[in-house]
Amino acid sequence: MSKKRLHEIAKEIGKSSKEVVERAKSLGLDVKSHASSVEEADANKIASSFSAGVTKNVQAGSAKDKQVAEQKAKAAKATTPQPAASKAAEKPAAATQEASQPVAVKPKSRNFKAEREARAKEQVARRQAGQNRSNDRKSDYRQLGRSQGQQTERAGHKSQNQQRDRRFDNRPSSGNNRNDGHRQAGNRDKNRSFNANSRQQDTGRQGQTQAGAPKIDFKARAAALKAEQNAEYARQRESRFREQEEAKRLEQQARQEAKAAALKAQTEDKKHREASAKATESVASMAAASVAKPVDKRRKKQNRPDKGHDRDHGLEDGQKKNKKSWNSQNQVRNQKNSNWNNNKKNKKGKHHKNSNTAPKPVTERKFHELPKEFEYSEGMTVAEIAKRIKREPAEIVKKLFMMGVMATQNQSLDGDTIELLMVDYGIEAKAKVEVDEADIERFFTDDSYLNPENIVERAPVVTIMGHVDHGKTTLLDTLRNSRVATGEAGGITQHIGAYQIEEAGKKITFLDTPGHAAFTSMRARGASVTDITILIVAADDGVMPQTIEAINHSKAAGVPIIVAINKIDKPGANPERVISELAEHGIISTAWGGECEFVEISAKFNKNIDELLETVLLVAEVEELKADPTVRAIGTVIEARLDKGKGAVATLLVQQGTLHVQDPIVVGNTFGRVRAMTNDLGRRVKSAEPSTPVSITGLNETPMAGDHFAVYADEKAARAAGEERAKRALLKQRQNTQRVSLDNLFDTLKAGEIKTVNVIIKADVQGSVEALAASLLKIDVEGVRVNVVHSAVGAINESDVTLAEASNAVIIGFNVRPTPQARQQADTDDVEIRLHSIIYKVIEEVEEAMKGKLDPEYQEKMLGEAIIRETFKVSKVGTIGGFMVVNGKVTRDSSVRVIRDSVVIFDGKLASLKHYKDDVKEIGNAQEGGLMIEGFNDIKVDDTIEAYVMEEITRK
């Protein structure tokens, strides 16, 4: 069956929700509010009760209730004949509805007079019900007074019997609580309409009386209704009293059972603790007592009232907890007011009302089996060991105490103590091998981390080496079909390049290294990462110094050498001479019984290039080059530079594993995450397999060319390793600082007299910076040395100019340009910036500057010789010597020496030179003149005067 909510029923029959709720409660239905739902039959029953004029909860089957209903019907017929007819018509209809339980239907025509009379009767009934509730509350107060020893029941009954009839009185009774004020305000409006209806009814009754209608005794009727209602309320009070007594008894019984359970739990817990105390020793007992939770054995004070009981006591009158009951609320409030002094001592929240319940028993720790092996490290605490072997720290403290070691759970233990402890437990102890996470070199020396099942063949890495302008870049350019050589300044390769080509379905990685003498370190670096070396030699030049150097690098790296004799198309080419010259340095052709392959090529005209590539693949197959692409990537930095928009850019050669974008990486003393990755063609890639050259961005600083790199598990580990490596490098640099001792004291003092040329080097790539700095430091000029104040990659900026001004240095830019702000600041601060693109021109210019830094060297040049013939003494002027030039000439600005008896008695400058009375600049051979010498007046006859000048000589 369908259900209806009470507010829907109220809307259908035109009543308020409150009236419908009260009517449903009076009919014995279990409802709480206007939102409660009832069955269809109960809904019809509620609607029928309003149609029949029922005012109270009348139980079905009660004979007395039927009698009251009959009396109401008779009184209604006697009072109003015409409305009685309508009531009589409604009563059978209501009876029919109760029998068949149909849905109430509104009549087609409304009888307003009958409706007003019905509302007036309902108001009278509600007033009477309110009066009865007031009487009930007074009766409850009397019962409460008797329980507290106040013995006021008889006086209360007397006042109740003497109280006048208040059925039509609008004043509230004194027994209502403060919520009655809201009910009184609502009753005033109802009383106004009731008075108006009463006046209309009185007018109608007068008309009926005049017409001869019988008179009705209202007092007798009201007294009968009141007596019946009082009897019903008395029965309800008796029923509530019995329910309350039963609830008290059940609550007392539950409290006694809870106390018994708590006492039993305490007894069992006490027995358990006594048994454990007897089984263990005193030290273990004390440790266990600190861990175990104590049980609260305090007894609750008897004079403290149970607030939870007081709160629930008023709700045990047969109603729900969330129902409103005027009697129960007043009773609880009075009880609280009477015990206000005791409640002050025990103001606990509602969460503490069940504080006397039995404590939960302490659950025993789950038993765990001991591990078979235990890997420990120095300095582990007792708590850490306990956590690893799944035991209590107190248990380990006890074992250590029995072993003679006093320790707490936070105390560190040495390795011997940990091993003895593990022996006591029967566990095999192993010391943990500490791995230096910052050490990248271990990946290159130990290949135990590689999985043999995942090892596959990789592409060979080939390095092209040779002398300057022997055709290395031209050969690589021919292989890649590009024109790199034309873009290189001066026709020489400035920095290393890495490229990858494909031949016969297989990839080959080529490294191009510079051949200039300044790039020795770059050639050595290229040989260290290569698998095969192609030594290119020009057929017309033969073996050159850098050719021999490349041979030595390849032999030191232990890699096979393939000799490519280039420029065989040129006139004067002599390959046989090249083969014989190489044999002198240990490079013997297979045709001569050696191990080196020789191929005659012409890189310019693409001759025998395929044969060279086939030879490379053949040698690679013999070498069995393998790699594991599944591990984390490791490799070497080929080149590094600082890009204005991208930051630090490093060219890496992957040697093991696969490098991915977003991998955390440590490169030398720097770290970061691979932000972007491009191949040799400038295209973006997401991964790089072994033997693949790529350029990456995302490093915090520019690394050094030749540094190793490794990928770490996460960025946190990579950052820690990078910072540790940078710290170690700084510490090593500080340790290398030379200290002054007695042995090098003279050298230190002598070095203070040596002049220095301060330079700041900025280049496009890191390899060029290294080569340029090394070349400048090798310049040998006596008395002058080069001091590299700062070297870095990238454009010349304002900070470089500021540093140059502070250190009086010259800025040298190699393949870079200064920013506009830096150029403007350099002009303002008078800082010299030299820009170059060819390295040997830089070396020549710096060497000239170093030579110019030395003090000039002077050489004496004799001009002439004169003899004093006569002397003249002039007062206030000095002695004037008359002379004759016997050799050469005497000039005005020349220096002179006075020689007497072959001894130089004075060396100085001329104060004046005259020919007769005229001042002249010089006096020639066999001429006479007069002179005065500054600061010397002791000129005598026959003194010899030598005239000379000091001329600066050029250093070679």
From Swiss-Prot:
UniProt keyword annotation of Protein biosynthesis present: yes
Annotated region described as G1, given as residue ranges: 466-473
G2: annotated span: 491-495
InterPro entries: EF-G-like_DII, IF2_II, IF2_N, P-loop_NTPase, Small_GTP-bd, T_Tr_GTP-bd_dom, TF_IF2_bacterial-like, TIF_IF2
Region (G4): 566-569
Region Disordered, residue ranges: 33-370
Ranges of biased composition (kind: Basic residues): 344-354
Region (G5), start-end ranges: 602-604
Listed Basic and acidic residues bias regions: 63-73, 112-125, 134-143, 179-192, 234-258, 266-276, 303-320
Subcellular location: Cytoplasm
GO cellular component, one term: cytosol
Residues that coordinate or bind GTP: 466-473, 512-516, 566-569
Gene3D superfamilies named among the record's database cross-references: 1.10.10.2480, P-loop containing nucleotide triphosphate hydrolases, Translation factors, Translation initiation factor IF- 2, domain 3
Sequence segments annotated as region (G3): 512-515
Domain tr-type G: 457-626
Pfam families in the cross-refs: EF-G_D2, GTP_EFTU, IF-2, IF2_N
Compositionally biased residues, Low complexity: 76-100, 199-213, 277-293, 325-343
Alphabetized UniProt keyword annotations: Cytoplasm, GTP-binding, Initiation factor, Nucleotide-binding, Protein biosynthesis
Alphabetized GO MF terms: GTP binding; GTPase activity; translation initiation factor activity
Polar residues composition bias: residue spans: 46-60
Record function comment: One of the essential components for the initiation of protein synthesis. Protects formylmethionyl-tRNA from spontaneous hydrolysis and promotes its binding to the 30S ribosomal subunits. Also involved in the hydrolysis of GTP during the formation of the 70S ribosomal complex.
Family: Belongs to the TRAFAC class translation factor GTPase superfamily. Classic translation factor GTPase family. IF-2 subfamily.
Name recorded for this polypeptide: Translation initiation factor IF-2
Species of origin: Streptococcus equi subsp. equi (strain 4047)
